[in-house]
Curated annotation (Swiss-Prot):
Induction trigger: Expressed in presence of xylose. Repressed in presence of glucose through the action of the creA transcription repressor.
Family note: Belongs to the xlnR/xlr1 family.
Protein name as annotated: Xylanolytic transcriptional activator xlnR
GO molecular function: DNA binding; DNA-binding transcription factor activity, RNA polymerase II-specific; zinc ion binding
Subcellular location: Nucleus
PANTHER family on file: XYLANOLYTIC TRANSCRIPTIONAL ACTIVATOR XLNR-RELATED (PTHR47663:SF1)
Any one of the GO BP annotations: positive regulation of DNA-templated transcription
SUPFAM superfamilies in alphabetical order: Zn2/Cys6 DNA-binding domain
Length: 900
């Protein structure tokens, strides 16, 4: 009886035990190579598979010898290799690779620890069982089979096996007996098995599927398992473990019983489940229950299994976790999906980077793609009881962190970052399943995915009100989806594909409006005291996550969850107004939708879990500076900008614009917005005086028990206190400088023109009006504030995502003055132009975008003319500047920075 290697059995025999024809084997061996592109580059798997398939085909024709032609061709090829490689140094091949290199399919030097594990900080070990290549000896196989036959028998068969063998219709198949013999083989004999299927004829497909038994996979070793397409088995795991799944399978598969899925049943004894797939340095992976959360990439068309939605993720309970195997257990749901992308330790580092602050005095995200903190750091990084998160949100956070991380895994080779980021992006989108959001837990139909198609509406998406699906009882899962959209949209907006980012922003705004994030949730049935217990609710995961497991609308919502909803809405509210200016579009989220929503709380209090009483907090869109974070100083400016954008849209209206511009309401509108800007300017001065004076007092007399100190060490010296106070003072002045600059730009937008071409052409002689002089004074004031910004933040890393458009719009008037006045320009205008050029150069270094590079060249050309260096082709220079600026239009049909 001929034998084959274990790899051939796993690929060609395991999934077709009822096939014995050579053509069927060849077609199957070809189909198994479809997924080879997912292996690491440079893998030897393809060569081994090709050689094994040839040996397997030859052994079927003649088990005692190989054809002479094949032997001759192989000998000739080997001799040619020896001839060509005689001059090259001999490369010694290691006997075995470490477990990490074997799993990641990377080259290993065989040392302990190896160079690869040392470079990336992985745990290097050689715990895998040693295997021998080639066929096992017939003596060993015969001895193992005799021992198995002596120990086995009908008495040792499981009740399921006896029932299968006695079923009417002769459903017994030799594959069952072969798998039973294999399960009793010793470990060293698993590398080769009997190919008993070759002697049997092929039964009909239906009966073969009915008789198919997967127990012979349960004893496969790790090297054999690596060749199985695990993604094709995930849907079976969902079907087997989900209690809401239909009891009857599709037609033709009704003969499957419980033992059929014994590979995926972690509760069955003596069964090797998917937990045996090792992730990182974990010895016992508790995340295998999440392997079925992602729909299979190539699922068969005859198995219409329901795909799980992100709202169903919390229904999988977290397994007990050892604190030594994973630094942040919050990553458990996403670990199975990223195991082949990044190491476990790097995933923890990227999550750390997401929450890293660039300042030790006040929270300020270090990543340019984290525009504001929506979640509490302690809730995510809790060592034992973290916040329950959807895998899509976690993948997007890792993707954001990977954009700027300096980890060696992402910087060597140079193409590594792009490859990893692309895989994380695809994973995030796949886990998010855009525009399809599942119903509440306990209310989902077993064939939910099929109903979405049959009924013709996107249930749980944008076709049905979320209230009808009980979304408020699972608000956290839906909030995770909105936050994932925000991460995707933010990174795309900062790239050169700004127009494409509007798809993600629109999805985030629409879902936030459906979830009614702009409204306060009703109070809980048994509301706790405003003080006391609520302070500790943020650190009690059972309270924090209890809304994920309820099936009705009476589930209590913790104060942390309420604040997450508020902060997410206000972040979307601010970006809506910011992007309306960037892309010359009307507003999406209205002030009326959030007129009764509490304003976001102070970031330091938020991260510390100190939730103030709701009765002492303001509601509605703010217009005054209240803090150091984006919600404190930038959100009020965006509230005022929303009114300016509405005014500009009315001015540019194709039918009513002329009437509005000549009517009496325009002046009243401008006066109301001017009063709001004046109020913000006064609040900015009060904010600076209040914080700097209090910090000066704190420097002279350090507090004995500081209430908020999220980054300080346990022991504090006077020098440490002094440095922290100085840093806090600088941080406050930097916030004031940014707020002052944007405030002056809003004055310019209120009084002036937005489009640079209309500004330079000046057909209506606006340059000689009083409003131009007022706007010009604010443009110079914005440039002076930009000089202060460069002093406190030389690389403009404090808010690079938002700052670029305000720097650009505040520079158009200076460009006009330089273009018209040339050598007669006021010295203050010249200094302002020089400051703008420096600021754009810093912006290009921090967050490089095309419009900033373009405008820097335009301003340099105009500044050279102001200094008296007028070129011979002066007219051509002016025309070239206008051609460049014509790409970015803020006219009625212009798209601003979004190039089409």
């Amino acid at each position: 009886m001929s034998t084959t290697s274990l790899q051939q059995f796993a690929t060609a025999t395991s999934f077709s035990p009822f096939s014995n024809s050579q053509s069927a084997r060849m077609s199957q061996s070809q189909s198994q190579t479809i997924g080879l592109d997912t292996l690491a580059e440079g893998s030897q798997y393809v060569l081994e598979q090709l050689q094994l398939s040839r040996e397997g085909g030859n052994s079927e024709n003649n088990s005692t010898f190989k054809p002479s032609s094949v032997r001759d061709s192989l000998a000739e090829a080997r001799s040619m290799i020896r001839k060509n490689s005689s001059s090259a140094p001999v490369r010694r091949r290691i006997s075995r690779a470490c477990d990490q290199c074997n799993q990641l399919r990377t080259k290993c030097d065989g040392q302990n620890p190896c160079a690869h594990c040392i470079e990336f900080g992985l745990t290097c070990e050689y715990a895998r069982e040693r295997k021998k290549r080639g066929k096992a000896s017939k003596k060993d196989i015969a001895a193992a089979a005799a021992a198995a036959g002596h120990q086995g028998g009908m008495g040792n068969r499981s009740p399921t096996d006896r029932r299968l063998s006695q079923e009417p219709g002769g459903r017994y198949d030799s594959v069952l007996e072969a798998s039973r013999v294999q399960s009793h083989l010793p470990a060293n004999g698993l590398s080769s098995i009997h190919n008993t299927q070759a002697a049997h004829s092929q039964p009909p497909l239906g009966s073969a599927l009915d008789a198919l038994h997967l127990n012979h996979f349960t004893q496969l070793n790790e090297s054999g398992r690596s060749q199985m397409p695990v993604s094709d088995l995930r849907s079976l795991q969902i079907l087997h473990n989900n209690p809401r799944s239909p009891s009857a399978l599709p037609h033709g598969l009704n003969a499957y019983n419980d033992n059929t899925f014994s590979l995926l049943n972690s509760q069955e004894p003596n069964t090797t489940s998917l937990n045996h797939f090792r992730l990182g340095n974990s010895t016992d992976n508790p995340s295998a229950q999440f392997l079925g959360l992602s729909p299979p990439a190539q699922s068969p068309g005859w198995l219409p299994l329901p795909s799980p939605s992100p709202a169903n993720f919390p229904s999988f309970p977290m397994a007990p976790f050892s604190g030594t195997s994973l630094r942040y257990p919050v990553l458990q749901p996403v670990l199975p999906h990223i195991a082949s992308i990044i190491p476990q330790s790097l995933a923890c580092d990227l999550l750390d980077l997401y929450f890293t602050s660039s300042s030790s005095s006040h929270l300020s995200p270090q990543s340019p793609y984290v525009v504001g903190y929506i979640f509490r750091k302690q809730s995510f990084l809790h060592p034992t009881k973290p916040r329950v998160c959807s895998p899509g949100l976690l993948a997007s956070m890792l993707w954001v962190g990977a954009q700027t991380s300096d980890a060696p895994f992402l910087t060597s080779p140079p193409s590594a970052r792009g490859r990893v980021c692309q895989k994380l992006l695809e994973l995030t989108i796949g886990l998010l399943r855009p525009l399809i959001h599942g119903p509440a837990l306990g209310e989902a139909s077993p064939n939910y995915a099929a109903n979405m198609v049959i009924n013709g509406v996107a249930l749980g998406g944008f076709g049905v009100s979320m209230d009808q699906l009980g979304a408020q009882s699972t608000a956290t899962g839906a909030v995770d989806d909105v936050a994932t959209y925000v991460h995707l949209a933010t990174v795309v907006s900062a790239s050169e594909y700004k127009a494409a980012s509007m798809r993600w922003w629109t999805a985030a705004w629409s879902l936030a409006r459906e979830l009614k994030l702009g409204r306060e949730l009703p109070p809980n049935a048994s509301q706790p005291g405003q003080d006391g217990e609520r302070e500790n609710e943020g650190d009690n995961p059972s309270k924090r996550n209890q809304s994920l497991h309820g099936g009705n609308s009476n589930v209590n919502v913790t104060e942390e969850e309420r604040e997450e909803r508020r902060r997410l809405w206000w972040l979307l509210y601010a970006t809506d107004r910011h992007l309306a200016l960037c892309y010359n579009r009307p507003l999406t989220l209205l002030d009326k939708e959030c007129s009764q929503l509490l304003q976001p709380m102070n970031d330091d209090l938020w991260q510390a879990g100190d939730f103030p009483a709701a009765t002492y907090r303001a509601v509605g869109p703010p217009i005054e500076c209240t803090g150091h974070s984006m919600f404190g100083y930038f959100l009020p400016l965006m509230t005022i900008l929303g009114g300016i954008i509405d005014l500009q849209q009315a001015r540019e209206h194709p039918r009513y614009g002329l009437t509005f511009r000549s009517g009496p309401d325009l002046d009243q509108y401008i006066m109301a917005i001017t009063q709001q800007l004046d109020a913000y300017g006064q609040s900015l001065k009060d904010f600076e005086a209040r914080y700097i004076n209090s910090l000066a007092l704190a420097e002279n007399e350090p507090p004995e028990n500081p209430h908020i100190d999220h980054l300080s060490p346990s022991g504090r010296s006077s020098s440490t206190v002094g440095s922290r106070v100085n840093e806090s003072i600088v941080h406050t002045k930097m916030v004031v400088a940014y707020g002052t600059h944007i405030m002056h730009v809003l004055y310019v937008l209120l009084a002036g023109k937005w489009d640079p071409i209309n500004l330079l052409e000046d057909h209506d002689m606006w340059i000689s009006s009083e409003s131009f002089l007022a706007a010009m004074s604010h443009a110079v004031g914005a440039a002076e504030a930009a000089a202060d910004i460069l002093e406190y933040d030389p690389d403009l890393s404090f808010m690079p995502f938002f700052f670029g458009i305000y720097l650009l719009q505040g520079s158009f008037l200076l460009l006009l003055a330089a273009d018209k006045l040339q050598g007669d320009a006021n010295p203050s205008v010249v200094r302002a132009c020089e400051t703008i050029v420096r600021a754009h150069e810093a912006c290009v270094v921090t967050l490089n975008t095309e419009y900033q590079r373009t405008f820097r060249k335009v301003m340099r050309s105009a500044l050279a003319q102001v200094r008296g260096r007028v070129p011979d082709d002066f007219g051509e220079q002016q025309q070239r500047r206008r051609e460049v600026l014509s790409l970015y239009r803020w006219t009625g049909d212009g798209t601003g920075l979004a190039l089409s």
